[in-house]
Structures are given as structure tokens and as C-alpha cells.
């Protein structure tokens, strides 16, 4: 028995980047918490990150990712480089290799998915979603993205609400964070 499910989505639209997640934590067949926070602002709010999977593993990955960002020391933020460096460590480190989590990271220019196998994927669309309800949220977001009147915030919120209606491991206690694109 283990912790299961969540839904996290990242969207870029109309000069904004949003990362949003539901709040449900499930252990086996039991909902343990309905208002967990699964997204974080990093580097003084310049980067948004969200996770699906084991909470303790995700916190470890947040910390490692933030270390990779700060390691450069020149003040320039390159989430692609940091994500690749994290993925290299994830694949080669005996302890990190056992972590069971996925991450979405986004800044004003990029959205990246960092998988549990150490892959880094930059989606073709300005939408990506992970977790048990990820496919539902992703499909809904692709449809909502065609509506020019909807903001990134509205697309994320509506997409997660759809996922919550369909996925038993996703709820409608949604937390959203937003940054302005450069």
C-alpha cells in the first residue's frame, strides 16, 4: 500500500504561467488529507514547481532542484540546465534513484516535466499535466486553450475541476500559483 494520486497542471497563456494542483492525499483506499499544498514558488517567485507522487520524495526533489538553480551563482536562472542536472543525479544517485515522484517546473519562458525515471520533457503545447488525473486535466486544458477569452488561471482551474469529477484520486481543493511572463 502506498500514497497514490494527485493532479498537477502547468499552463502558459496570454503572458502568464500557472501551476495548479488539487489537495488530495490518498493512502491505499483512504483519503488522508484534502487540502495538501503540492506546488511551491522557488527563487523568490520566479519559478513554480508542482509534484505528484510521494510527498517526502517530492520535497527532496524540490530541495535538489533549488540547489541546482542556485549552484550557478551568477544570478542567471536556467531551469532547463537545472532540470537536466537534477535528472542526471536522479538517474545515477543510489538514493535519488529510488524516489517516487514527478515534477513540473515552470518559469516565465519554459514549462518542463521531470519524470521519475530522470527524463526531462519540454512539452510541444503550452500545457502539461501529471498525476493520476493528469490525462483528464491535460485533455480539458487542450480544449480550453482554444478559447481566447480564458486566461491561463481559468484554463488551469477548469481543467482541474474536470479531473476532480472523473479521477477518484483528485479533489476540487485547488491551489494555483501564477507568474508574469517576460
From Swiss-Prot:
Q: Which InterPro entries does its entry note?
A: ATP-dep_Prtase_HsIV_su (IPR022281), Ntn_hydrolases_N (IPR029055), Proteasome_sua/b (IPR001353), Proteasome_suB-type (IPR023333)
One annotated GO molecular function is: threonine-type endopeptidase activity
**Source species, please?**
Borreliella afzelii (strain PKo)
Which residues are responsible for catalysis? 6
A single GO BP annotation from the record?
Answer: proteolysis involved in protein catabolic process
Q: Which gene encodes it?
A: hslV
Subunit structure and binding partners? A double ring-shaped homohexamer of HslV is capped on each side by a ring-shaped HslU homohexamer. The assembly of the HslU/HslV complex is dependent on binding of ATP.
**SUPFAM superfamilies, sorted:** N-terminal nucleophile aminohydrolases (Ntn hydrolases)
CDD domains registered for this protein in UniProt = protease_HslV
Domain of life, per lineage: Bacteria
Record protein name field: ATP-dependent protease subunit HslV
Amino acid at each position: 500500500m502506498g500514497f497514490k494520486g494527485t493532479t498537477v497542471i502547468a499552463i502558459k497563456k496570454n503572458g502568464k504561467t500557472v501551476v495548479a494542483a488539487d489537495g488530495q492525499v490518498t493512502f491505499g483506499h483512504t483519503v488522508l488529507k484534502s487540502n495538501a499544498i503540492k506546488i511551491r514558488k522557488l527563487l523568490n517567485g520566479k519559478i513554480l514547481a508542482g509534484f505528484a507522487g510521494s510527498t517526502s520524495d517530492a520535497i527532496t526533489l524540490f530541495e535538489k532542484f533549488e540547489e541546482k538553480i542556485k549552484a550557478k551563482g551568477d544570478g542567471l536562472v536556467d531551469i532547463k540546465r537545472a532540470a537536466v542536472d537534477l535528472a542526471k543525479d536522479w538517474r545515477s544517485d543510489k538514493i535519488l534513484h529510488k524516489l517516487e515522484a514527478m515534477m513540473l517546473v515552470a518559469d516565465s519562458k519554459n514549462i518542463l516535466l521531470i519524470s521519475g525515471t530522470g527524463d526531462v520533457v519540454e512539452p510541444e503545447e503550452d500545457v502539461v499535466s501529471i498525476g493520476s488525473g493528469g490525462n483528464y486535466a491535460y485533455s480539458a486544458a487542450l480544449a480550453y486553450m482554444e478559447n481566447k477569452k480564458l486566461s491561463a488561471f481559468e484554463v488551469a482551474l477548469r481543467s482541474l475541476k474536470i479531473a476532480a469529477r472523473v479521477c477518484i484520486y483528485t479533489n476540487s481543493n485547488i491551489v494555483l500559483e501564477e507568474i508574469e511572463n517576460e
